[in-house]
Regions:
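Conserved catalytic phosphorylation-site environment of P-type ATPases
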Residues: 2-76, 231-232, 250
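P-type ATPase nucleotide-binding
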Residues: 59-190, 200, 212-222, 227
């Protein structure tokens, strides 16, 4: 009986402690496997930054005003679910700009969007996306992009009928707890990696702020999956932390996927093994310690129950235990297992 109680009781207590701290484990396996994590891969938007980008710069080309550029981007991004698109829409609405309806809306995941607005063919996305669509970026636009990237800003280019008409830059705020989280993971002999769809310079800027040395930028969703698989081929257990639709495949591929629960997309939460309901990234080191403590409790309980059973059988063979005392010893073993699991309650794991 004690042997059968060892694992489920410890898992139940571990799940309870996780829920108490805003961590939801979908399976017992995810609770057990998190402690084995050797590499934590993080997306930038959400885990490292607050995930609420704001428009900071509007750089129109010659012959177009800032309001006109913003109206074009507003019409395109109105149907977008991307955080950058939502930020542009919110900014335009605050200025009470009129919304022109778009048609033939198409989204290329991780790159950009296209649509027809008032008979014009509009594109909105990163530099690579516009170039793939046959739009050339002028020297002035390239210079503006370089300057914005060095400031850690994400840049969205807008094109009309094959001609780039300007750049809209957005900036996100670094999570104050991100740097401390990376430091704690490093102290636990756990490496951190940044996987992001942002350009290399923007990614390097934020990675330097939190102390992440290994950075992979300009990634599409399938590229993130490839990077996770490559990290796993080093015979490492990889934990992926993300919040967006683009992170879902990587969350599913990783040994353990952790989604930002309240701010994350439904698809990301569904794909993940664990959800951070409070979006508190500082819980990641706690998550690993809780997993390790739970597994240690399971091993200790199994060892203790086996020793008690072996001792009881030996004493019974020697005639030192009668059926009544044997039953008491058997039940005592079950009580010990429950008490050991209860020691997990209210532990800080600091």
């Amino acid at each position: 009986c004690a042997l059968g109680l060892a694992t489920p009781v410890a898992i139940m207590v571990g799940n309870g402690m996780g829920a108490k701290n805003g961590i939801m484990f979908k399976t017992a396996v995810s609770l057990e496997e998190t402690g084995k994590t050797e590499i934590v891969a993080l997306d930038k938007t959400g885990p490292i930054t607050n995930g609420t980008p704001k428009v900071t710069d509007i750089v129109p080309a010659d012959g177009i005003s800032q309001d006109e550029l913003l109206r074009l981007a507003f019409a395109l991004e109105a149907k977008s679910e991307h955080p950058l698109g939502k930020a542009i829409v919110a900014y335009a609405k605050n200025l009470d700009l009129p919304l022109n309806e778009s048609a033939a809306f198409q989204m290329t995941s991780g790159k950009g969007i296209s649509a027809e607005v008032d008979g014009y063919q509009l594109l909105c996305g990163n530099e690579k996306y516009l170039q793939e669509c046959g739009v050339s970026v002028t020297a002035n636009d390239a210079g503006a992009l370089e300057k914005l990237r060095l400031q850690g800003k994400a840049s969205i280019l807008v094109a009309v009928n094959g001609q780039c008409v300007g750049v809209i830059a957005l900036s996100d705020v670094l999570r104050p707890e991100a740097a401390a989280m990376v430091q704690k993971l490093t102290a636990m002999q756990t490496n951190t990696v940044l996987l992001t769809g942002d350009n290399q310079k923007t990614a390097d800027y934020f990675a330097a702020q939190v102390g992440i040395r290994e950075v992979y930028a300009d990634l599409l969703p399938e590229d993130k999956v490839g990077n996770i698989a490559a990290l796993q081929q080093r015979d490492r257990n990889v934990c992926m932390i993300g919040d967006g639709v683009n992170d879902a495949p990587a969350l599913k591929t990783a040994s353990v996927g952790v989604a930002m629960g309240s701010m994350g997309s439904d698809i990301a939460v569904e794909a993940a093994d664990i959800a951070l309901m409070s979006d508190d990234i500082s819980k990641i080191p706690y998550l690993k310690r809780l997993s390790n403590a739970t597994v240690k409790t399971i091993k200790l309980s199994i060892t203790l129950s086996m020793c008690i059973n072996f001792l009881a059988v030996t004493l019974s063979v020697l005639g030192l235990l009668n059926p009544t005392t044997g039953a008491l010893v058997h039940n005592a073993g079950s009580c010990f297992v429950v008490l050991i699991a209860a020691l997990l309650y209210d532990r800080k794991f600091e």
